[in-house]
């Protein structure tokens, strides 16, 4: 019987569906809470062979993957995928290299450079942390005063926040479309609708989701 370890830090619907699917396909699942896990880096003191990496935390995810891969464990997704997929700037450059259209983006490596960018490129801009999710620390900057305050605050945080990543503000209906792609095939999609008075569509911030039918478009 096939055996797979699911490494997690939060049990969500997706993990429950994976467990249910494993049972239907006669696959043994071992659930391991990464928050309770410690590993001797110099000894292979476990019998884990294949891991589905499901940690929500980016740093917990990539560091635990690095450890397990270093000990010969097959991890899905692999370390390289985890690093790139969890960083918006890295992902943007991969999409650009692949010829996939994305909102125009700019990066500045200091407050002075960021303010110069605003002076030359204008407003509005969306500022996002390169690492993060659920719409946290994502702001729409409309003028120099708000730019100065937001970037000044980020400069006092962890060095990851000193990488100032900006995207154009896309004028759209109060919804966007999130599509799941496997290989070259779009397999599922949802509409994400903004909550009243909020331009963000994150469901974590009050947005709502509904089914989006996959079409040739």
Model-predicted regions and their roles:
Residues 139-217:
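Phosphate-binding site of ATP-dependent enzymes
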């Amino acid at each position: 019987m096939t055996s797979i370890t699911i490494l997690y830090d939060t049990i969500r619907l997706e993990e429950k569906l994976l467990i249910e699917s494993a049972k239907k396909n006669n696959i043994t699942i071992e659930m391991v809470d990464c928050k309770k896990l410690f590993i001797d880096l110099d000894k292979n003191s476990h019998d884990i062979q294949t891991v589905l990496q499901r940690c929500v935390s980016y740093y917990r995810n990539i560091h635990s993957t690095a450890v397990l891969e270093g000990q010969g464990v097959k991890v899905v997704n692999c370390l390289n995928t985890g690093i790139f997929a969890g960083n918006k700037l890295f992902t943007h450059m991969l999409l650009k290299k692949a010829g996939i259209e994305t909102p125009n983006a700019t990066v500045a490596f200091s407050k002075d450079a960021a303010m110069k960018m605003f002076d030359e490129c204008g407003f509005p801009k969306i500022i996002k942390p390169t690492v993060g999710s659920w719409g946290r620390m994502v702001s729409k900057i409309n003028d120099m005063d708000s730019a100065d305050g937001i970037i000044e605050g980020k400069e006092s945080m962890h060095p990851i926040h000193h990488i100032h990543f900006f995207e154009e503000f896309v004028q759209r209906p109060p919804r966007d479309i999130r599509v799941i792609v496997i290989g070259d095939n779009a397999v599922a999609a949802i509409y994400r609708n903004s909550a009243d008075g909020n331009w963000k569509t994150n469901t974590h911030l009050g947005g709502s989701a509904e089914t989006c039918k996959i079409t040739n478009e």
